[in-house]
Amino acid sequence: LSVGEEQRMLDYLSHHPCQYNLGLQICLFTGMRIGEVCALRWQDIDMISGTIRIRRTVHRVYMIDDGPKRSELTMDYPKTAGSYRDIPLIRDLALILSDYSRDSSGDHFVISGRACPTEPQTMRNHFKKVADELGLSMRRFHGLRHTFATRCVESKCDYKTLSSILGHSNVSTTLNLYVHPGIEQKRKCVEDMIRSIV
């Protein structure tokens, strides 16, 4: 998302509060993977220390056997060792979360508000609906993670820290997959270099 699109989306989400929109806000403010957001429980959020603990992920597993096609929603461990992490809970997100946490039990899932998690495909479908309503060109849920990473780079976040926040095992993954400099960022880079030599 461009900065303008992200601002429009955040404005829309804040004016249309619901559990699924909360999931989109969490992604934009943390860069969490869709399965991690769906697996997030209230007990994973520490408002006092300002951290979110990521220890689980949710995904749908398709069963391959001779019978009819079937699948099941499973709770699993994160992707890599680096995916087990604590990430910062910024004040803006903490304020949003506090509105939802009042009515929730610690073992309930943040997005569903219940004892069972939200299906990742449900979040993907919801995001597409919001993107359509806002006229956004980006339609892939994972693009929210890319948007977070790009904003961090634009804000001069060092790559090692960003890689740790995203749960990557090495910095090259972050740079190769998630950093998308736009023309304005490229222009600023060249202008800064020119200013340093003249």
Residue ranges and their predicted role:
Residues 58, 94, 166-192:
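Catalytic-site neighborhood detector that most strongly recognizes the C-terminal catalytic loop/helix
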Residues 5, 19-20, 119, 123, ...:
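Hydrophobic (often cysteine-bearing) scaffold residues that line and stabilize catalytic clefts
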Residues 1-34, 38-40, 48, 59, ...:
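Basic, Lys/Arg- and aromatic-enriched nucleic-acid-binding interface segment
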Residues 2-6, 67, 88-137:
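Active-site/catalytic core of tyrosine-dependent DNA strand-transfer enzymes
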Residues 20, 48, 83, 105, ...:
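Exposed loop/turn and edge beta-strand positions of beta-sandwich/beta-sheet ligand-binding modules
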Residues 25, 29-36, 126-133, 143-169, ...:
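C-terminal catalytic core of tyrosine-transesterase DNA break-rejoin enzymes
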Residues 12-15, 74-84, 111-118, 135-143, ...:
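Short, contiguous acidic/charged loop-to-helix segments that flank catalytic cores in large enzymes
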Residues 3, 39-99:
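Conserved tyrosine-mediated DNA breakage-rejoining catalytic core shared by Y-recombinases
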